[in-house]
Amino acid sequence: MTKSELIEKLATRQSQLSAKEVEAAIKEMLEQMADTLETGDRIEIRGFGSFSLHYRAPRTGRNPKTGTSVELEGKYVPHFKPGKELRERVDAINT
């Protein structure tokens, strides 16, 4: 599902809100989440999951085009950990 598909679906389900209002709310929510992660803080949405930053240590990688070794710097990457309710709903699909 893309962001525009999500906006369309939410606007359909929430008839009191226009698609523009839903779009503004989603954009603001995503902006706030990005700002929070940018400061190194964690985001927890109970039942859904949590977003945090994980550190990837420096390592030696490989350029897939040339095959040469490349030194990669350490960096922080966004990480999502699904909550218990979300895991259970997804597991129910698989059974």
Curated annotation (Swiss-Prot):
Family matches, as PROSITE patterns: HISTONE_LIKE
Matching SMART domains: BHL
Record keywords: DNA recombination, DNA-binding, Transcription, Transcription regulation, Translation regulation
GO CC term (a single one): chromosome
GO molecular function: DNA binding; structural constituent of chromatin
GO biological process, one term: DNA recombination
Coiled coil: none
CDD domains per the UniProt record, alphabetical: IHF_B
Pfam families cross-referenced by the UniProt entry: Bac_DNA_binding
Job description of the protein: This protein is one of the two subunits of integration host factor, a specific DNA-binding protein that functions in genetic recombination as well as in transcriptional and translational control.
Assembly description: Heterodimer of an alpha and a beta chain.
PANTHER family tied to this protein: DNA-BINDING PROTEIN HU, INTEGRATION HOST FACTOR SUBUNIT BETA
Protein family according to the UniProt entry: Belongs to the bacterial histone-like protein family.
Entries under HAMAP family matching the protein: IHF_beta
Protein name per the record: Integration host factor subunit beta
Organism encoding this protein: Shewanella pealeana (strain ATCC 700345 / ANG-SQ1)
Gene giving rise to this polypeptide: ihfB
